Amino acid sequence: MHAKRPSVLFFTISDFGYVNVVLATIYELLLRDEVDIHIASFAPLKPRLESLVQLVKHETKKSTDSSPGVHFHNLADFPGFATWAAQSKDRKKADVPHPPGRNGAGRVALLTLKALAIMEPEQYLSLFDWSADLTRKLNPALVMVDPILLPCHDMARTLGRKYAVLHPWSVADGLIPRQGWWSEYWKYPAFSTGFPYPLPWGKIPENISCYLTSKQCHSHPKVQALNQARYSHGIKPDPLGSFTPFAEGVPQITPSLPAVDLPMGNIPKNVFDCGPILVASPPIETSDPDLLSWLRRAPTVLVSLGTHFEAYAETVREQAIGIRILLEARPDVQVLWKLKREATSEKSGQENLESILGQAIQDGRVRTESWLKADPVAILRSGHIVCSVHHGGANSYFEATWAGVPQIVLAMWYDTFDYATRVEYLGIGAYGNREKGRSCVVDEDNYVAPNLVDGEEFGAALLRVVGRNRADPGAAQITKSAVILGEVCRRSGGRVRSAEIVTGLCFGKLDY
């Protein structure tokens, strides 16, 4: 290691897709080898970091002693972690989905409250103190914080440290209110509505209602109590952030680009759009040669609804119906389906799958996997994927956009509805469950996650994007638009640009 080099300290959670922007940036920082790298996160991230370091050593052909490394600090060491983890352990991923718009606004407000009041005051302040002690000990030139760890934002700001936010998603929700003329009410779809852009006039009343409902949590007693505890602890008197905390004068590094987002004229200097910040991944030829052999058989639709999605039997049935509609119309197409079933309905889900797609599975036209060995980016860039069906997660959206592959979004929660809006606005795919999602009504007092997929609607979206035949002009135009946008993304810099910004901030060579 070089003496007296500046260091950067990352604070991040370890969720698989969410943390990819951090891993991608660290990969490039390791290749540059100009700064020392520390990361505070949870234990599941450590093996991925170790693999990343080994990949860089292999690529640079440096010896173990001379290779740069990453210093890992276990975020679970803060004293309040055990209590916090115990409170969160019973949450089921399959119960997260909610409708868009008016019918889901109450649920969005509740989930936003949980994001703001992410911990009880005692735990929040415990993480604040722990991260402050670590920062004082390491004295990094730069602190990098992910959007969710609000105590670490507070720490960096209160200690007066130079810090930046590395986002896995667009910061549009933080920028839209800056566009003027109250356009967040009448022009831009409110968070989690899935409304088209520009907003249709008839949707304005519901849009305003959803926008205001999502803000109500800021006055909730839990948030008020946490704010009081923060201020009493000496934390600078700024209100809690949001899903996309936007702070004046704090660099915001994002995987977005103007070309892949909703149009906004007022973008501050401290927002650095890098384009998709994707992890370095081995080609599919080495990571899963068996899958590559199967992909080479026919044009393939990739169905993968994200790390956190677990499908109840009813959802499995409706997805299977949509896939069957495509296969019946397009005998030249096959489907790779990453399917993770919800545990209590796994048997009935399997029965639904076999009754609807049993023959196609036997014939090898449908391949189901609970996990994909190859990285999604490697699969998307194999040249064999004609459509990516995903849940609208930011990571999935940016991966498919970068790869130049048409998309269908089966939106499930939070901002996934917003990425469905982007896909349709940009002409690179379809919102595959708009009507079903809009028709769902839930009981807030006895909440049961609804099925948000209708097989017929999903099948129609597949035919629209993949085409009813090889010469379908509508599908050809969608593919053309996706390919053009992919070329823009791949020229944008992505993880290289993100690492350049981090390095520039460490050395004080970047204006913002």
Swiss-Prot record:
Q: Which InterPro entries match?
A: EryCIII-like_C, UDP-glycosyltransferase
Pathway assigned to this chain's UniProt record:
Antibiotic biosynthesis
Q: How does activity depend on pH?
A: Optimum pH is 7.5.
Please describe how the activity of this protein depends on temperature: Optimum temperature is 30 degrees Celsius.
> Looking at the keywords, is Repressor present?
no
Carbohydrate attachment sites?
N207
Signal peptide region:
1-24
Which keywords are on file for this protein?
Antibiotic biosynthesis, Glycoprotein, Glycosyltransferase, Signal, Transferase
SUPFAM superfamilies this protein is in?
UDP-Glycosyltransferase/glycogen phosphorylase
What EC numbers are recorded for this enzyme?
Answer: 2.4.1.353
One MF annotation (Gene Ontology) recorded for this entry: UDP-glycosyltransferase activity
Please provide the Gene Ontology terms (biological process) for this protein: antibiotic biosynthetic process
Q: What class of enzyme is it?
A: transferase
| Record's catalysed reaction(s) | sordaricin + GDP-6-deoxy-alpha-D-altrose = 4'-O-demethylsordarin + GDP + H(+)
The similarity comment for this entry is: Belongs to the UDP-glycosyltransferase family.
* Known function: Glycosyltransferase; part of the gene cluster that mediates the biosynthesis of sordarin and hypoxysordarin, glycoside antibiotics with a unique tetracyclic diterpene aglycone structure. First, the geranylgeranyl diphosphate synthase sdnC constructs GGDP from farnesyl diphosphate and isopentenyl diphosphate. The diterpene cyclase sdnA then catalyzes the cyclization of GGDP to afford cycloaraneosene.
- Recorded protein name is Glycosyltransferase sdnJ
